[in-house]
Structures are given as structure tokens and as C-alpha cells.
Amino acid sequence: MSSPTADVEKLRRIIEVARGDRRADFVVKNAQIVDLVNEEIFEGDIAVAEGFIAGIGSYSGVEECEASNLVAVPGLIDAHTHIEMSMLTVSEFARLVVPRGTTGVVADPHEIANVLGKDGVMLMLEEARSTPLRFYCMVPSCVPSSPLETSGARIGVEEIRELLEEEEVLGLAEMMNFPGVVSADREVLEKIVLAGIVDGHAPGLRGKKLNAYIAAGASSDHETTSFEEGKEKLRLGMWVMIREGSAARNLVALKGLTGNRHTMLVTDGDRSVKDIIEEGYLDHVFRRAIEEGIDEIKALQMLTLNPAEYFGINAGLIAPSRLADIVLLKNLRKFEVRDVFVGGRRPEFKRFNHPEWAKKTVKARKITPESIQLKTGRVRVIEVYDGEIVTGEAIEEVQGVDVERDILKAVVVERHIRSGRVGKAYVRGFGLKRGAIAQSIAHDAHNIVCVGVDDGSICAAVNRVIELQGGIVVADAEVRAELPLPIAGIMSDERAERVLERLSEIEEEVRKLGCRLKSPVITLSFIALPVIPKLKLTDLGLVDVEAFRVVDLQAD
């Protein structure tokens, strides 16, 4: 129940507590309460009844928490995230972030949807209901992301219609197909008219095309990277979500927009398990905002009240009738958490047992050296850049893998329908001197992607990923390190600390093989995404993203 008006008897009890005629279930006493509307801090009690805030003032409760010298703020809300990118399940993710003050997320589960479709989204909703995390969901709008790759499922108009009936589902997730919106593609428009809220995805879109995109219903954007671009989007009525993650960091460029009530701070799912454990989640984003000179209350608004108002979530403010999601801080500027309450209760966490069907998603045929042979001569080469998800294209004369020139072999193995398809290409930028790294995290279709020096290591790494039913594997003739990811082939069923330990082992082994990329796993995961320029590799072959077509390995 997200509104106190949903049940008459509960509403009666809440009103009685608010009047002072009935003891509250729980009271936070003598807190320094942050008023996000008047932008001030005042002292008072917070009375909770039936999971909602009943009143602010002087109250007594059946249970009380003394909060003298503590600052009370609403639980933080991540307005745009992809939990699967952390490689953690929802329950394990919740165990990490809720104690740090993040009590709500609005997730776009398009990663699992590309593997398991509607059933995968429903599984995440089911798991989330077993956690204290307020898990709101936007229906993935572009699954698959492109016809130039093979995904495990499709989310069409009918699936969107069915998912929108779920209580936690708020609207349509980032509409990446902005060309389809602007050109009034019928299927795209059919998806839009079903949804109340439509999140946008419009990098660099300006002028009349931006007008058309917004006129169609896209009401937010998290891809803004410049102040002028953000200012135009705000002027035209859009809400701007400012990313501050592990890789994509736009806060510095966009901090001039942060005083606006139509701006939010988000992670976009771009917080690695290492960074969550060592630095934090939205609490870290808040601290980054403070480091950039943003006022504490303005920063809080962008992480609480603003996303709540945009999505119509009954939270984000310490005020009567709001969900009693309260964070008590020892220090506001440092966001030093003393206590967290969700619905007026301290959160409890438990494990979730995933069904076997969610653990058997890798249906690929094992590869052999014969199946991954590459042409030589004058060829196209994918160029990767450290810390970037865009790639370049080079034309080189090659006679095969050339370690001295850092020209390696890349393969993408289809893993959803057992077609046996293998996309093959040359890639430069990984720096491997020997061995290979393979993984079943490959945005967005999550086929198996691998980069390596020799065929033996490539086959060893890819085939071990298949045996694990998903994961990340480093091989040098034989397996050197591995991280099993059995849930849809993209998430671990282990504790976050163990995931970090295994991931650290993988990165150490990759470094030993010569790679100097800051995040080799992330870089590898994006060379298969055929909607981000320039040259990508899918199971169907080399993709020229700007031309939106498969191209031949050999250059004309």
C-alpha cells in the first residue's frame, strides 16, 4: 500500500495519531528535520502509523527512537538505474544500499528482459517484494535494442500492456529509439500511448527533433552531457536526470542546472559492486554533489523530492501522509548514516531462492578453433577507448592477430537459441599479450563476448562461460580466474563481498595478461552494443552503427 487512503480503517488510525488522540506505532524524537519545501531545518518529532508519517510536532509512541543531534532526511530515491549492471540480485543489492540511505529505486530491467523477457521482469518484481527496498519499475521499451543482434526475448506492445498492470510499474523506460519517435513509427507510438510516464533517452537531441520527441510524450532524459543541451531540455519541459556513476560522470558539466526543481541525480545503474562497497551508492552521489559546491538541501531535493514528484511516488518528503522512509544522519554534509527506517521499521534482509529456469539461459554451442577463423588482408578493426563505451573504426592490413600492433581477435557467440552463430572481428585497445577474457555480459542482448590472442585461450574462456551457465572467465591456455553469473547469465547468486573478491581476481589476471584498461569487463561488455557508435560486433557480424547495417570484415 503506497497511499494511506487505500484502506479506510488504517486511514482512521493514522488520523487519530495525527490528532494526538492515539499513540503512534513509532516516533522519531527530537530530530533535526530537513524541510525540503521551505529549504530549512527545524526540530521536531516524526510520528509514524501504519507505515506512513502521521504527524510532525510533539508525539508519543509505542516505540520511540531518540534522535537528539541527528538529522532526519527522507530515504534517497534513484530515479534511473539498471540493478543487473551491478552483477547482484535485487535482494543482495538491497542489502548493500538500504543501510546507506537509499530506500527506493526506479529500475529499468532491460538487461534481464533481453534474456528472459516479461518473465525476467516479473521475477525481479517478485524478488524485490521480499526486500525492504522500494522497487519501482519502468517497462523496457526497446527489447531487443536493435534487429542487428539476437536477444533471448522480445518486449512488444502486448507485453508492455500486461506489465503496466503491476502496481510497482510506473511507465515506459528510456525510449532509446528516438529516431522512431521523431519519425512517428507506428509500433513505437503504440508503446508510448500505453504508458503514463515515458522516460527519454536522447543524447545530443536538439531543436525541432527534440520538440517532436517531447511532444510525443518523452518527459525526462539521462543522456544530457552539456549545460546548453540540458538548459534547452528544461526549457521545453523535460526533467533532466544528471548521471554520476562509476564511469559516466556528468555532474561537473551540468552542475549549473542543479538549482532547478526539474533536475535529479541518478546512477543510471553505473555503480560497480566495488564502488558500492567501498564508496557507497546514492550517498556517494550526494557527497559528490557537496564536493562540487552544491547546497545540501538542493542536493537532497534532487535525490528525494524531485524524483518522487516526477514519478508520483508518495515519498521524498518528511511530511504527513508520506511513506515513513526516514534516514537519520550523524552528519548531513558527509551523509553519515546512523539509522534507516523503511515504513517506520528497521529493514531486515533475507535471501531469495531463484527458480531453476532463471539459471539455465546459456544455450550456446561450444566453439572450436575452426569455428572462429578470421579473414586476413585489408580489414575493419574495432578500436576501443579506455573509459568510453563508444568505439572507433580503423582500416588495417593484417595477416591475423598482431600483438605488437595490439590487434586482437574478438568473437560474439549467440547463446539464446542455439543457432551456432559466431560474429568475428579484429579489435584494438585491450593490450593483451596472451590469453583471453570472455563473459556473458554483453549489452544489450547478452550473448557471449570474448577478446583474446590465441584460439586455444579464446575457446577455453568461452566454453567455460557456457559450462558455468554464464559468467566472466579469464584463460591463458587454461582457466585462470572465473566469476559465475548463473542468474540469467548476468547476475551472481553469491554475496556481494564474494563477487567483489572474484572480480578482483579476474582483473588481476587480466592485468597479468597485459591489459591496462581501467575497467576491462565494462569495456568488453559494450563492444557488442549496436546502438552506440561506431563499429560494434554482434552474433550477426560487424555492425556499422551509424549506417545501421552489418558490414563485411574486409574493407573495400
From Swiss-Prot:
Keywords: Hydrolase, Manganese
Annotated coiled-coil segments of the chain: none
Gene Ontology biological process terms from the UniProt entry: adenine catabolic process
SUPFAM superfamilies associated with the record: Composite domain of metallo-dependent hydrolases, Metallo-dependent hydrolases
InterPro entries linked: Adenine_deam, Adenine_deam_C, Amidohydro-rel, Metal-dep_hydrolase_composite, Metal_Hydrolase
Matches recorded under Pfam families: Adenine_deam_C, Amidohydro_1
Named cofactor requirement(s): Mn(2+)
Entry GO MF terms: adenine deaminase activity
Entry keyword annotation includes ATP-binding: no
Catalytic reactions on record: adenine + H2O + H(+) = hypoxanthine + NH4(+)
Gene3D superfamilies assigned to the protein according to its UniProt record, in alphabetical order: Metal-dependent hydrolases (3.20.20.140), Urease, subunit C, domain 1 (2.30.40.10)
Enzyme nomenclature, EC number: 3.5.4.2
Enzyme class label: hydrolase
Family: Belongs to the metallo-dependent hydrolases superfamily. Adenine deaminase family.
Name under which the protein is recorded: Adenine deaminase
Species per Swiss-Prot/TrEMBL record: Archaeoglobus fulgidus (strain ATCC 49558 / DSM 4304 / JCM 9628 / NBRC 100126 / VC-16)
Gene name as annotated: ade
